[in-house]
């Protein structure tokens, strides 16, 4: 799995919008494509199986940057600064790594956390490393009519402005959830691979061109 985003290029095919007579038309771009902010990874959540039960009370006494409050949460929290990440360690031996900006950083952080526990005498392994969620964000640099967006795709959108200011958009392929704001900002969640973020961006870009709010 690649740890870097592949470049996204937008061609005329990406900008085609079907008209009523089924002939594609090209909608005038709200802003030049080179001004649009491509998705940037904000957080990667990964899991690892250590295949070893962990005495969390023992670890919190012996590791400096560790926190454990079983009344509030059933996992031990450890933080490291390089790469800057946070780990949740469960008694069962499950390790959750959050805060990574690349897959390689997440894997490296996971190995460092495993090493910390190994130095304490735990016979840990590093098995089944898996990316569970990739969160990214971008700015389209043009305003979006959220009302038009939910009219365009009523079955896969949810908009409750009194509760949340953005549209929740459920993309089918790739299967992800996007949070879309009137300002043009988008948050991508639920991706399992970096490539899915890029594909989701290309898909939503074509849709948002149809609901660009040129009045703002």
UniProtKB/Swiss-Prot annotation:
GO molecular-function term, one example from the UniProt record: RNA polymerase II general transcription initiation factor activity
GO biological process: DNA-templated transcription initiation; positive regulation of transcription initiation by RNA polymerase II
Sequence repeat start and end residues: 38-121, 126-210
Function, in words: TATA box-binding transcription factor. Members of the TBP family are differentially required to regulate transcription and development during early embryogenesis.
Keywords: DNA-binding, Nucleus, Repeat, Transcription, Transcription regulation
Coiled-coil ranges (or none): none
Family note: Belongs to the TBP family.
Protein name, as recorded: TATA-box-binding protein-like 1
InterPro entries: TBP (IPR000814), TBP_CS (IPR030491), TBP_dom_sf (IPR012295), TBP_eukaryotic (IPR033710)
Subcellular location: Nucleus
Source taxon at top rank: Eukaryota
A UniProt-annotated Pfam family: TBP
Organism: Entamoeba histolytica (strain ATCC 30459 / HM-1:IMSS / ABRM)
Signal peptide: none
GO cellular component: transcription factor TFIID complex
